[in-house]
Swiss-Prot record:
Coiled coil: none annotated. One of its GO terms (molecular function) is structural molecule activity. InterPro entries: Keratin_matx. Disulfide bonds: none annotated. The gene is KRTAP3-1. Belongs to the KRTAP type 3 family. In the hair cortex, hair keratin intermediate filaments are embedded in an interfilamentous matrix, consisting of hair keratin-associated proteins (KRTAP), which are essential for the formation of a rigid and resistant hair shaft through their extensive disulfide bond cross-linking with abundant cysteine residues of hair keratins. The matrix proteins include the high-sulfur and high-glycine-tyrosine keratins. Sequence repeats lie at residues 3-7, 8-12, 47-51, 55-59. This is Keratin-associated protein 3-1. GO terms for cellular component: cytosol; keratin filament. Signal peptide: none annotated. Residues 3-59 are annotated as: 4 X 5 AA repeats of C-C-X(3). The keyword Membrane does not apply. Keywords: Keratin, Repeat.
């Protein structure tokens, strides 16, 4: 429940990994849905109620962030500096706030 309240994102239960390049930040308002079972593609962020400006920008395209699930292989991103953030699954279900 704590991890859900902290993130407040519409991420399904289970572990998920977000890859971000150093020129973008995937925290505060960038809530990405799972790409599974679809192909990995660039996703549009969703604004969360708990995120103040300027982090929270609805309808803003973030081309440098991907959300991966373990049913997808890691995309070939050679030559790009990446930072990996791992969001653990929640122990108990909670309501999404996005």
């Amino acid at each position: 429940m704590y991890c859900c309240a902290l993130r407040s994102c519409s991420v399904p239960t289970g572990p998920a990994t977000t890859f971000c390049s150093f020129d973008k930040s995937c925290r505060c308002g960038v809530c990405l849905p799972s790409t599974c079972p679809h192909e990995i593609s660039l996703l549009q962020p969703i604004c969360c109620d708990t995120c103040p400006p300027p982090c929270c920008k609805p309808d803003t395209y973030v081309p440098t962030c991907w959300l991966l699930n373990n049913c997808h292989p890691t995309p070939g991103l050679s030559g790009i500096n990446l930072t990996t953030y791992v969001q653990p699954g929640c122990e108990s279900p909670c309501e999404p706030r996005c």
